[in-house]
């Protein structure tokens, strides 16, 4: 293990929640995970992120399925990521330049945001098992490895998404550890990319 790998592993262990003692964790089936994800309507949570360079960021997650997600980072970070209608935009709120844009289908987050999740019928699933008391499922597009992969981690009692790890095609890893997911009334304006462009980007730079 090289120094970078050791540092990343240490950061992941610090961020990763431990399964509660006294509760016997069980392996969730792909059917159970699919049912859980399809049951998510609108939730919010705090999060802690371990970035590819081992720096730590915090922020707030808004998730409104299908298709909508917003991750807004706390200061001093200036990042904002939002997706709606199949489009994902990544803003640097201090840059005064337009966001980077990607089709959601070309990102690992598609697994989480698609309308009907059926992991039993997904050729994208490349891993499923237990680690550290959590059930994990790992997915990637075998025809498009350059899109990267995502590993979702779940508790079993109650069933809940606790974290994810995104790995890009170059070996970079980004780990997101979620706080408790809370049901919420979330206005769709929170995912309005064009409105955010108008707010953050001077007209001459759009």
Residue ranges and their predicted role:
Residues 35-54:
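A short, Trp-centered hydrophobic/proline-enriched beta-strand micro-motif
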Residues 10-17:
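Bacterial N-terminal signal peptides
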Residues 47, 69-73, 88-91, 137, ...:
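Short hydrophobic/aromatic-rich beta-strand segments that constitute the beta-sheet cores
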Residues 37, 107-119:
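Short, solvent-exposed helix-to-loop capping segments enriched in aromatics
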Residues 3-7:
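N-terminal export leaders
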Residues 56, 60-111, 174-175, 180:
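An acidic-aromatic
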Residues 20-24:
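Boundary at the C-terminal end of the N-terminal hydrophobic targeting segment
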Residues 120-121, 126, 130-206:
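Gly/Pro-enriched, hydrophobic low-complexity segments
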């Amino acid at each position: 293990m090289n120094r970078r790998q050791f540092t990343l592993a240490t950061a992941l262990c610090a961020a990763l929640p431990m399964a509660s003692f006294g509760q016997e964790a069980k392996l969730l089936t792909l059917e159970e995970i699919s049912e859980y994800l399809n049951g998510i309507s609108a939730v919010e949570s705090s999060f802690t992120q371990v970035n590819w360079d081992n720096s730590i960021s915090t922020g707030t997650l808004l998730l409104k399925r299908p298709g909508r997600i917003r991750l807004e980072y706390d200061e001093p970070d200036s990042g904002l990521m939002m997706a709606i209608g199949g489009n994902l935009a990544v803003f640097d709120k201090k840059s005064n330049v337009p966001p980077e844009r990607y089709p959601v289908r070309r990102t690992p987050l598609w697994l989480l945001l698609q309308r009907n999740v059926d992991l039993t019928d997904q050729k994208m699933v490349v891993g499923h098992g237990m680690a550290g008391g959590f059930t994990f499922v790992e997915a990637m597009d075998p025809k498009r490895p350059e899109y990267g992969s995502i590993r979702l981690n779940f508790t079993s009692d109650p069933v809940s998404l606790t974290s994810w790890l995104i790995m890009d095609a170059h070996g970079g890893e980004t780990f997101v550890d979620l706080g408790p997911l809370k049901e919420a009334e979330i206005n769709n304006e929170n995912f309005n990319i064009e409105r955010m462009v108008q707010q953050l980007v001077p007209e001459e730079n759009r």
